[in-house]
């Protein structure tokens, strides 16, 4: 299991792991975060079928991954002093905080580099692929400058789910032109960047979550100036429907 602070690519630097199937699970103690990482099966949804898929990699299609930089222990650092370092810098400072000289908290990336026997990741033969995803409420949160748990974000989240289907389908499959038509240019651009992994990452360290954004600071204001997000949302959805013909009604 890769955990939030690592991904398959990081683990592909360790040849000893080539024989294992990488899985990615979510935090069961936080219902709203279920599916932040997930495993994709094409099997019967039974224990025996899923276990066999993990052993043989037949019927196991891969994982949905949280960007590892968003994890609390991806990089090395000292939270109290605001110090975040990569493994090379940590070695240069002999494992000590350059501000207070106390020991740095070593992150997952550092540990991977210590154990790695490959200079570059190499995908093992038969290993499934994976996709990076950002939870839809977090994308809405960035666009609307509100908490993921705020009323305005949650309201639009459920409207989108009602219109387009489940969250994975919306993030991965719904055509961008449909998203732009019903939710506006800014939203479509956010999903396009996610699908192309064009995101802004500030890594987490020493128990501090990293940040993942799809827009640069100030960029939203510029895009909204081109096509007002307020105008896009002036008439909020009052009904939602999804059909097998890929028609959406918001």
Question: Model-predicted segments: where are they?
Answer:
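Charged catalytic cores and adjacent phosphate/nucleic-acid-binding surfaces used
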Residues: 1-250
């Amino acid at each position: 299991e890769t955990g939030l602070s690592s991904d398959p690519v990081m683990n592909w630097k360790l040849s000893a792991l080539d024989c294992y199937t990488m899985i990615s699970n979510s935090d069961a103690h936080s219902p709203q975060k279920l599916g932040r990482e997930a495993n994709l099966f094409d099997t019967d949804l039974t224990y025996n079928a899923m276990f066999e898929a993990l052993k043989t990699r037949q019927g196991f299609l891969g994982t949905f991954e949280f960007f590892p930089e968003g994890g609390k222990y991806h990089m090395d650092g000292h939270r109290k002093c605001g110090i975040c370092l990569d493994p090379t810098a940590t070695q240069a400072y002999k494992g000590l905080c350059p501000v207070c000289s106390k020991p740095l908290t070593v992150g997952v990336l550092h540990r991977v580099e210590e154990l790695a026997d490959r200079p570059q990741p190499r995908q093992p033969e038969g290993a499934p692929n994976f996709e990076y995803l950002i939870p839809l409420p977090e994308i809405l949160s960035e666009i609307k400058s509100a908490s993921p748990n705020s009323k305005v974000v949650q309201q639009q989240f459920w409207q989108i789910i009602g219109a387009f289907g489940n969250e994975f389908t919306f993030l991965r499959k719904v055509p961008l032109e449909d998203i732009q038509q019903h939710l506006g240019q800014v939203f479509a651009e956010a999903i396009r960047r996610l699908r192309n992994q064009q995101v802004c990452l500030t890594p987490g360290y020493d128990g501090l979550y990293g940040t993942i954004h799809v827009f640069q600071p100030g960029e939203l204001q510029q895009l909204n100036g081109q096509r007002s997000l307020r105008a896009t949302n002036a008439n909020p959805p009052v009904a939602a429907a999804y059909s097998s013909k890929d028609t959406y009604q918001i």
